[in-house]
């Protein structure tokens, strides 16, 4: 079976790898010069199934209003004048209730836990290296109210069988020794020992090389113009004025998936949520993290690679604007210096990317009303966490194989206005 995968971020490359491993003849098309050159390039680096939490949560509307008046707020909303932005925010607000939160979190954790298992199996099979560590993640609380609020998430972790440890402030240094210097600022933390970390860019490029060895044909610097539709099927994809054909097509264009599907009247509710990161060389390992630390107050993740610290976070709703906002850099630097001042900030590199976010935070993985068009997009901040599982799922769906886990609630069908099948 011939399959064209559109997109070479971590989701697209993982899809191509698993399709090829199961015998498909795969071509990957991308406008960039190589894999992982956009959203997958500089993300925060954590693989955190246990922290797969919907952004649409009870209390978020109130917090969003409060954050509008804070200098180092984790969320910024810049109205871009589009009706789509307002519609997306309204859809998200509809999910900010306990019932929707529970449904969405279960879906997210189902994919994320499966994905971690797939990643471990892939690592065992291929020996792939990407500055990976398996030392867990630690969520930090600066306020007692945060310690109390985390009980809701702990109950979900217990239901899903996820190992965890709730720590007092004076116990944090046992997990992250460098935090012994910051104990007076912290009241406690939630440690998930089974989470992992790694450089998504290195992983995606290494996996692309493995996929090439399986026969995947990567075509970069391509102007992917449109899908050619005939009835309820895709007949081809127009690239640089020419039409390429396959038996089946997988769309993994991230934030750009929605506009690409507009001519097909598939209303994909994926909005670009802008995030930022700093990559900082380590000069003093004693003041650097061992794994990933999540600052609950500022919603910022600080991750250890081999000789670098990756600091990522923020959520900015400003359309497809890729400008670098120095205020966001100041927030990332402030949190890093406060907790782990072991890096050379003068040599830090500043980056931004667009996360493809759905209103319910759950990715869109599965079939459409077009018989040979499949979607693998909308992973938001969890594309790295969910990549391998999503790639394996979509490959099984495309090739009509039985999936390892339930796909209930993952396809575009959950958005009734999208007319999905």
Swiss-Prot record:
It catalyses: a D-alpha-amino acid + A + H2O = a 2-oxocarboxylate + AH2 + NH4(+). Its EC number is 1.4.99.-. GO terms for cellular component: cytoplasm; plasma membrane. GO terms for biological process: D-alanine catabolic process. FAD binds at residues 3-17. SUPFAM superfamilies: FAD-linked reductases, C-terminal domain, FAD/NAD(P)-binding domain. Keywords: FAD, Flavoprotein, Oxidoreductase. Signal peptide: none annotated. The keyword Isomerase does not apply. Pathway: Amino-acid degradation; D-alanine degradation; NH(3) and pyruvate from D-alanine: step 1/1. Pfam families: DAO. Its cofactor is FAD. GO terms for molecular function: D-amino-acid dehydrogenase activity. Belongs to the DadA oxidoreductase family. Oxidative deamination of D-amino acids. This is D-amino acid dehydrogenase. It comes from Acinetobacter baumannii (strain AYE). The gene is dadA.
